[in-house]
């Protein structure tokens, strides 16, 4: 599996500069750049350590082949991104990217790892690297993010 992050939320959407300065008891703006850098580093570290997205993030996952149940290690609160030009797709025998209808797969984004099951697997999938692409949205928003994070 290969994945590419499509959106990069700002770490200060999760922890604001004002919140960090209050926590650090800093009342001046001389160190704002440094504190903002620390927020970004902490944000990246927590995401890597917990394997979660702290803010809603779009990610494209690529697979050579899909199994009966394909695990997608990203979270939390995963959904298939069905925005224009996104979803569950494959490269067909003619080399054309083809999207599956929602009726052709089941997706469990509430579990970890998230699971995808193809119900009606197409017969014209090209035997190539990254033949399958699954576009997801995952992560917390301001109302669902646990206080501990």
Regions found by a protein language model. Name each.
Residues 1-149:
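Divalent metal-cofactor coordination and adjacent catalytic microenvironments
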């Amino acid at each position: 599996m290969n994945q590419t992050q499509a959106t990069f939320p700002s770490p200060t959407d999760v922890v604001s500069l004002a919140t960090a300065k209050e926590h650090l008891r800093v009342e001046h703006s001389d160190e704002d750049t440094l504190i903002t850098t620390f927020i970004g580093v902490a944000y990246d570290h927590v995401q890597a350590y917990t394997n979660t997205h702290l803010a809603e993030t779009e990610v494209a996952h690529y697979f050579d082949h899909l199994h009966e149940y394909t695990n997608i290690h990203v979270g939390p609160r995963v959904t298939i991104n069905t925005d224009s030009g996104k979803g569950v797709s494959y490269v067909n025998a003619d080399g054309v990217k083809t999207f599956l209808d929602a009726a052709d797969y089941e997706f469990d984004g509430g579990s970890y790892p998230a699971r995808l099951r193809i119900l009606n697997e197409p017969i014209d999938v090209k035997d190539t690297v990254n033949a399958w692409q699954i576009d997801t949205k995952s992560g917390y928003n301001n109302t669902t993010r646990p206080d501990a994070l």
